[in-house]
Amino acid sequence: MQGGTPAFEAKICPPDELTARRRALPGPVVFTNGCFDILHRGHVTCLAQARALGGSLIVALNTDASVKRQGKGEDRPVNALEDRAAVIAALESVSLVTWFDTDTPLDLIKACTPDVLVKGGDWPVERIVGAAEVLARGGRVESIAFEHERSTTSLLRKIRSL
């Protein structure tokens, strides 16, 4: 590509367009969410595994304010929402990227009615937000075991100690 907007930018979907754009995705539609602040191997592996569970993958990102409310530190997120969205959208495994400013993605999950809801292995299925709603519609909820134990918080600790 020479100049112009990269094609992956088209995957960035404002929340108010999610329901309509979800209809155009091949199914089953998989949904996951998180901060994805400093992308690492654990993130990309989990996203690739999530995508393998269906025909498309929607990733919902916490807004910057939502990340701050999680208590990860005043300097988090390191990367602003627009940058995190672009990096996630550039991944081959990702079909759409959206965001939520609430403490949980429950409203987005209800709006886009995914067929499969996924979180990383640190989330037991019974604690995954939206699990009851997805299961009630006949969908599946999966907790994907970590293949590569990585942590953004640990990476930041290591960087700060240098």
Residue ranges and their predicted role:
Residues M1-L162:
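Nucleotidyltransferase catalytic core that binds NTPs
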